[in-house]
Structure formats: C-alpha cells, structure tokens
Amino acid sequence: MTSPTRPDRSPIDVVGSVTAPEAAAAPRRRRPRPLAVIGVVLAAVLVSASGAYAANAAGAELPVATAVVQETPPTVIDAPAVAWPSYGAGAISAVGVQGPAAGGMLASYGSTGQLPIGSIAKVVTALVVLSAKPIAEGTDGETIAFTSTDVGYYNDSVAENGSVAPVSAGLELTEREALTVLMLPSANNYAKSLAVWAFGSEEGYLAAARTWLDERGLTGTVVADTSGLSPATVSTTLEMVVLGELLIGDPVLAPIVAMPSAVIPGVGTVENTNTLLGQAGVDGIKTGTTDEAGACLLFSLDATVEGRPVTMVGVVVGARTHPQLAADVLTLIPTVEAGFRTVTLTEEGQDFGSYTSAWGESAVAESGEAQSLLVWGATTVTTSVSLDPVEVVADGQEVGTVNVDVNGQAYPVPLVADGTIEDPGFGWRVTNPGELFG
C-alpha cells in the first residue's frame, strides 16, 4: 500500500521553521519598571538640591549678633554757693572751661549792661597799641622819645586829678618800658602819650580802638578816652573778663601786669596798684578808680583744682574802696574754686554693651581710654550708647559710640570690641537653616 505522499517542504520553510525547544531557549525582553526610574530621578534631584543648599549656606550672610546696651545712670552736680560782694557787679571765667553763665562765664552777678570801668580801659589801650606797634620776641620794641607835648599830657592829667607818672622832654623809653609805666602805676599821661605815638592823635587811637573791639565782637565796650577817666568809657562785666583773657594771652603784657614793681630809667620805681598780687594765686591784671565806676579790679589767677592747673579771670566793679574790694575778692576766690568738678566721660576699658552671636560667641563694646572733663557749677551728665549692627567682630574693631552729654554739650567717644566673633564655619551654616535664612 502506498503511503500518502507528504507535501514537500520548501527550503525556506525548513530553514525558517523553529521547533518548540528552540523557541523556548530564546531570551525575552523586559519592560522598564516605573518605580526604579522614579528613584533614580529623585536621587539625582536630592543630590542636586543638597549641593545647591550647601552652596547657598556657605555663601549666605550670617545673622546679626544680638546687641545689648549697658545702661549708665545720670550724674547730677549741684551749683556751688559763690560769695559775691553785696555791691556792684562782677563776672568770672576759667580759661578753657565752658561755664553755665552767659557768655560761657562760670558765674556773674549784678548788672549785665554797660558800666563805667575807670582805668580798666588801659587794658584796651595797651592791646590796641601793641596791635599797631608789636614787640618782637627777644626785643623791647621801638624807642619812644618823649617831648614837651608829653609833659603837657602830664600836666593835664594832674589837673584832672588823674593818676600820673613822671615824664620829661628828652626822655627815651622802650615801648616795653612805657607800657610798664602805663599798666603798673596806671599813669593816665602815659596812656595818652602811647596812643598818640602809635596812631598820631587821640582821635586816631579812638577810631582804631573801635575797629579793634568790633573785630573781636566786643560791641558793648566803648572807649571815649585813652585812660578811662571819662564816664563815657564803659563796658560790660562779661566783656571786661574777655579783655582780661586777651591780655593774659599776650606775651608782652602778661608778664608786665604780674610785676609788683619795676625800675624804669628816667622815671624811677613804679609800683603796681594791684595789691592782691601774690595772694590766692593772683597774678594780674588792672585796677580802676573813678567816682562813677567806684573801685574796680580786673584780676587773673592761677590755681590747681581737681588736680589740674586752671587760669581764672574775674572782675568786680563798684566797691567803695580798694581795701574793701581786695578783701572781698579774696573771699570770693575759694568759693569759685570749690565749684570745679571732674566729670568722667569714660574709664579705660569701661563696658557700654555687648554682642552675642547665634552660635554662642560674644564680645564686649568698651571705651578704649579714660577721658574726663573739668566742669564748674550745676552739671547734669547723661549717657547714650549706639552700637553698630555686626555679624562678626575682630578684637579692637570700632563698633559704636557712647555720647556723653554734659549740660547739653555732646562728647562722642568711640567704642571698640573686646573679644572676637568669628564665622562659625560650614558645619554650623548647613545645620542651622533657621538661623541662617530666617
């Protein structure tokens, strides 16, 4: 029996066909898993974010350190009791000390208006003459030849019952010698002789004196003559003190008015009319006496108060006699000296505040050096502190100011850091985002 004939397989069918075992052995492709992909992405994002945060933290501004101000209680000093005379008027100052009274005076009493000043006017005469005819250091100035005209001035002064000193035609004195005769015995005739010598006439002097006074703001002082004998020659107590300050600052006149006496060739011994010289530190300046002015004294003195040297200038006018005036000024002086006090602005290394950083470091704001101020009279001292905002601080760095107010006058003192606040570093920055970024 013939078997059924199978259809012939084409070569393609043979080659292309796959048996079941072969098919089972072929590898299978896997589809990506979504969760794995997400994990990789998140990891990359976290790494990137961490790097960005770290970079931001490393470069971010640090928080400002907390500043605390150390409060300083105010200081109050009571006014002293000054023993002014019961008559006349007066004022007193201390060179370089701002006083509480008008014009920076320490104290004053009586009239503040214009008053006759007698021979205190010779302070103006001497200063104005020297402004026109200065005496060079180490010299005695020009030589002045006196004539019969000067003898006439002497006779006129005698007739007016004014103070005089001898003069003769042909007498020659240096300018320094002539000024000595003017100031010590208060010679009226020498006041006119010097004024005419320097300015050509009394009128020329009066015009120059007016200009000189105006240039110094002394508008309350009026000179109607060279000696002060005229009642129209007036000033205020405040301006008389200023004139005294100008005189003691002059290198020619200050030594002259401090001399008790002097021997002048052709004139003789001249005595200083200021009997207080050498008492209570008094070393000047000028007496004055007229019926209208009474007995007057413009005085200066050197004292040591609160361990410091102080020069004071004062004036008292209107006394009945010079002995009474001298006694009253001697009573006055210690009561004025008692009114000085030293006010401490800052002590060396005094704490006025502190800084504390968010990471626990601290520094103190302190004054670098001790500073003090000499004051007189009723005084109120208050202190205010201004600390600069800082993140880090170097030792010795200026960090603020303490303003010490003394009777309305501010005295600023810089504050410096005692201690160091440093950058806390990368570790603190990356672990304290709340402090760093708020």
Locations of regions flagged by a protein language model:
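Hydrophobic membrane-insertion alpha-helices, especially the h-region
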Residues: I38-Y53
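Acidic/histidine-enriched alpha-helical segments
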Residues: V252-G266, T344-S357
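Terminal targeting segments of Actinobacterial cell-envelope proteins
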Residues: M1-A36
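Active-site-adjacent loops and short helices of periplasmic peptidoglycan-processing enzymes
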Residues: P4, N56-L238, E245-P251
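Solvent-exposed coil/turn segments that connect beta secondary-structure elements
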Residues: V95-V97, S131-K133, T147-V151, W197-F199, ...
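A penicillin-recognizing enzyme superfamily signal
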Residues: A254-F340
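Short Gly/Pro-enriched turn/cap motifs at secondary-structure boundaries
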Residues: P80-V82, G170, T287-D291, E391-V393
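Conserved SxxK-family serine transpeptidase/carboxypeptidase catalytic domain
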Residues: T5-D8, A54-L62, I77-D78, G339-G438
